[in-house]
Amino acid sequence: MLRIYKWHSELRGIGRIFYSHKPPAPVKDIGPRRVFKVYRFEGIDSRKEPTIQTFDVDVSTCGKMVLDAMIKIKDMDPTFSFRRSCREGICGSCAVNLQGRNCLACITLIPQSKVVNLYPIPHMYVMRDLIVDMTHFFNGYNSIRPYIIRKTQGPIGQYQYAQSMRDNLKMIGLYECVLCSCCATACPSYWWNGRRFLGPASLLHAYRWIIDSRDEDTEQRLKDLRDDFKAFRCHTIMNCTLDCPKGLHPAQAIAKLKLLISGLQKKENPDMDPSRFASSGDWTQKCKIK
């Protein structure tokens, strides 16, 4: 065992810090059997109360991801309902609450636990089993106008707008969001003020479009967010960053967005004119969509 002793002075005298570098403990093999406790609900038209149904699953007969186990459960009970699509963490469809944490089932390993609790993501109206109503979430997202707005533009969809590499790098960690709502449904502020607080995902995208050097509607976007609730209900609880399956940092984006809304910071001017290629006769002919 490697032991490193480091001496340092403190206000109350000289202390010693002991550092012990140990190899990580091996994961205990608990066998292939898992007991899945799954939330079941037949829908709002049913008069039955929600229940927890237990499934004994041999995970050695399916893949390693939670979604594989969910598909295995559906083979056992075809009435079990959930959303899925890409199976690669791109579409954001399979968001669930696993062992009390939000995640994407397709990129989350089956826990090394005998009992696995599987619920729909919280603070959403449940339509059936693990399927929730995403209408309110996407209404908030659409309200931030998630697209480039130009005051001076040519024929829509026929020309591309220029952007420097430095300006493009500002959006790294923002445009990777897949709108799975894991962050929003893990946020207590969104639970408490869901009707007016836009939530981490929508605010992350709002910041992404505001700092985009190709967008020309910055002032109106910021004006729309100057509200006591839309952005400033964020209390930096950090659940959004903790539960983001893509490893993004919505709380950081919201903090920077607040500086722009309050006027403490200004949007930087673009390194190049985004429409300069559209004004060039030679380039417009090359960029035109045939």
Q: Which residues does each PLM region occupy?
A:
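Ferredoxin-type iron-sulfur electron-transfer modules in oxidoreductases and energy-metabolism complexes
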Residues: 64-78, 119-290
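Short loop/turn and low-complexity linker motifs enriched in small/turn-promoting residues
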Residues: 40-45
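Short strand-turn-strand beta-turns centered on an Asx-Gly dipeptide
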Residues: 39, 50, 97-101
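Glycine-rich phosphate/adenylate-binding loop and adjacent beta-alpha elements
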Residues: 100-119
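N-terminal mitochondrial targeting presequence
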Residues: 1-31
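Short, contiguous acidic and Ser/Thr-rich linear segments
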Residues: 51-64
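Active-site phosphate-binding and catalytic loops of NTP-dependent enzymes
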Residues: 21-23, 77-83
